[in-house]
Amino acid sequence: MNTLDIQRHIADRLAGRRRLLVAFSGGLDSTVLLHALVQLRASCLPHLRLRVVHVHHGLSHFADQWVDHCESVCYLWQVPLHVLHVQVDTQRNSVEAAARDARYQAIAELIDSRETLLTAQHLDDQCETFLLALKRGSGPTGLSAMAQSMPFFVCEQLRPLLDISREQLTAYAQVHDLSWVEDDSNADARFDRNFLRMRIVPLLRERWPHFSEAVARSASLCAEQEQLLDELLMESLQALMSEDDALSIDGLLPLSEAKRYALLRRWIACFGVMMPTREQLQRLWHEVALAREDAEPQLHLAKCQVRRFRRRLYLLPTLRSLRDEVLRWDPHQPLTLPDGLGELQMGSRGVCVRAPTPGEAVTIRFCAQGVLRIVGRRHSRAIKKIWQELHIPPWERERTPMLYYGESLIAALGVFVTQEGQAVAGATMWNIHWSKDWM
């Protein structure tokens, strides 16, 4: 594939997309991609609107020099450059994954909803990704490796070089006398991807010269099989999901294990969560779905958790405990609740309760215990039973503001008022409104 072939290949992959945000590290791959786009804009695609983004991770001593290089290149080629600085969580097991997450989150905040994000992964990257998935014991989803096109937050990510080898990109760069930076970490064989690129893939290609192309075909076939399964299982999945995206356990029970796990995977994929391992799926089913009826089981997946309530599975963000929070409140002023739960304020609407006596301190908490009687009920009940009878899921109980006067529970706002808090005719009453930013 010569220079013009590569440019034509990229033009074909663009397929009418005209507003592009190019991820530019300054390395060989993204340099070739950006150069080809600039050439296309100058020759046959004058309506291309290019922007470039470079992410400074702060992980290398050379990071500032890379920024300088990218600025010089973009100035020369007359494309606007945005440099984003991110903080990478170096305490995570994989610094590479942490850097990728931080990079994509920063780019997501920059990209315009009408733009397409272009990244420069190529054929050899695809081969390495496939082998890494194979090493992890992945199924067809993981072995599909990287897609040519995929959703990126509210936009789209396109990889137009995925069929082009590193060798072809190097030849292109040499023909056009391009300069690029070398990431010093790419020479560190302690990283799995580098180990594959430096030691394993060259050995495989020495024996089988077209090994990377064969791997790419296998990845493509796996992706086709997954797409077919998605289409075949979509109707079944929709039948099992409620309006709040919960998944019916009873609907999964009579199914074969293979179909049940396939549906669980696709349900999880609906939330954009990293695909669970087989062991995690087995734990989800046996430890959460099939836990004893009086249990409140949960399983953490990446930054989410799977919970069960009333014979349904729910996938939720991981929430910090608020059990120890005690917020003093002057009800004549709005109160901002923690964790984005909204705001409390007095007004003409909301929960109606008696006003406190002069000696009663007003606080907001997020837990309650013991036995109490709520307005509208004749008998006292354990609060856990009350929650269950009102069909309030455990995770919502833990994030419902509880109004206390002294040590007396007055109301679970938006849910119930206790006998202690009942407004009596002729007495001073308060209306407390909870403006929710969640649920």
Curated annotation (Swiss-Prot):
Catalytic function, reaction form: cytidine(34) in tRNA(Ile2) + L-lysine + ATP = lysidine(34) in tRNA(Ile2) + AMP + diphosphate + H(+)
Key words of the record: ATP-binding, Cytoplasm, Ligase, Nucleotide-binding, tRNA processing
A single Gene Ontology CC term: cytoplasm
Family: Belongs to the tRNA(Ile)-lysidine synthase family.
Xref: PANTHER family: TRNA(ILE)-LYSIDINE SYNTHASE-RELATED (PTHR43033:SF1)
Function: Ligates lysine onto the cytidine present at position 34 of the AUA codon-specific tRNA(Ile) that contains the anticodon CAU, in an ATP-dependent manner. Cytidine is converted to lysidine, thus changing the amino acid specificity of the tRNA from methionine to isoleucine.
Annotated protein name in UniProt: tRNA(Ile)-lysidine synthase
Species lineage: Bacteria, Pseudomonadati, Pseudomonadota, Gammaproteobacteria, Enterobacterales
Designated gene of the protein: tilS
